[in-house]
Amino acid sequence: MAAIIVVGAQWGDEGKGKATDILGGKVDYVVKPNGGNNAGHTVVVGGEKYELKLLPAGVLSENATPIIGNGCVVNLEALFEEIDGLEARGANASRLRVSANAQLVAPYHVAIDRVAERFLGKRAIGTTGRGIGPTYADKVSRVGIRAQDLLDESILRQKIESALDQKNQILVKIYNRRAVDVDEVVEYFLSYADRLKPMLIDATTELNKALDAGKSVLMEGGQATMLDVDHGTYPFVTSSNPTTGGACVGTGIGPTRITASLGIIKAYTTRVGAGPFPTELFDKWGEFLQTTGGEVGVNTGRKRRCGWYDSVIARYASRVNGFTDYFLTKLDVLTGIGEIPICVAYDVDGVRHDEMPMTQTEFHHATPIYETMPAWDEDITDCKTFEELPEKAQDYVKRLEELSGCRISYIGVGPGRDQTIVINDVAEG
């Protein structure tokens, strides 16, 4: 029995899809515990590149059952477009299951999200405009639509009517937009009901019974620690808890059943959208990391902001999540750059901070304190063991491990599934 959580340790785009793809072939279930189609991940299988958004990467595994958990928000149009796109390429998504308690994104959620961002102007958060935040807001306000509501049209209509009593006031009186018709929303949801119903399960019961029977579960977190609504760079965050604790809540698997918490972290740092980023680069090295690392968002097509490795964030993420292991990705991108700066602390208005500053104001004022290490020139993309890495690459990895306070058990040396050095396999305990 293994219950493994995969969590992004930075601001997303760390390579969680690759980690999940590698581990997904060794487990019985792969579950997405949070988020929606607002964050994408890329998986390379057999030389084929797949860009997934709402679906767990485990959908590409031949054996694992992929599940969208109760902590997710599901845009049905996006879900079935993604399924159809995969199946058109020969993939089999028939094993996919959806928690009956997952929240559904309604057309009015998307409308409110987009108009609200435009309304904020320069103060905009930089959301993807896919209705994720408004859907989570309705969830905690207890007026959300759940997947199980599609099983009873009368309940579905009643909930939509109740929600639109409020939403139309917002759209018409605040944002000067037209009111949303109840029948249109009901018809929208019912158009997907027949396809969705066979997928619905009591995910919490099924997953816990699977663990009782000695089976293995992998929880694939979306977004990342620094985008967590409680622990991230608020307000420039997502609307859920993409951390270890959030994975437990988003699946119904209790924390005492977790056998490994695997943090995914790049050998440098990236971020998409607005918000503070102490090690961000605006020179040729930022452009180099962006170009060489292929740093363009899967979901938005936006170029990612790039910077050097930030060990303050790495230590913080280790503590917040209780990581047992790190999966270091994109080490190959740093080949041949001469010297590699590592942020070991911050200077905040003349005061050294070895840990995350307490306030966001301080974090906005943080400037990195660097130490440098020599880079390597050798091609590492075919290295299969840690010992095969050049000595300078080994030294860099060891230093990151020391600074993060967590062992590095996997090292990505290229985009392919087989371009991964495995030091300690968490799927095997």
UniProtKB/Swiss-Prot annotation:
GTP binds at residues 12-18, 40-42, 304, 330-332, 412-414. Its cofactor is Mg(2+). It is found in: Cytoplasm. CDD domains: AdSS. The active site is at D13, H41. IMP binds at D13, E14, G15, K16, N38, A39, G40, H41, T128, R142, Q223, T238, R302. It comes from the Bacteria. One of its GO terms (biological process) is IMP metabolic process. It is an enzyme of class 6 (ligase). Pfam families: Adenylsucc_synt. The keyword Metal-binding applies. It catalyses: IMP + L-aspartate + GTP = N(6)-(1,2-dicarboxyethyl)-AMP + GDP + phosphate + 2 H(+). GO terms for cellular component: cytoplasm. PROSITE patterns: ADENYLOSUCCIN_SYN_1, ADENYLOSUCCIN_SYN_2. Its EC number is 6.3.4.4. Pathway: Purine metabolism; AMP biosynthesis via de novo pathway; AMP from IMP: step 1/2. One of its GO terms (molecular function) is GTP binding. PANTHER family: ADENYLOSUCCINATE SYNTHETASE. Homodimer. Belongs to the adenylosuccinate synthetase family. This is Adenylosuccinate synthetase. The lineage of its organism: Bacteria, Bacillati, Actinomycetota, Actinomycetes, Mycobacteriales.
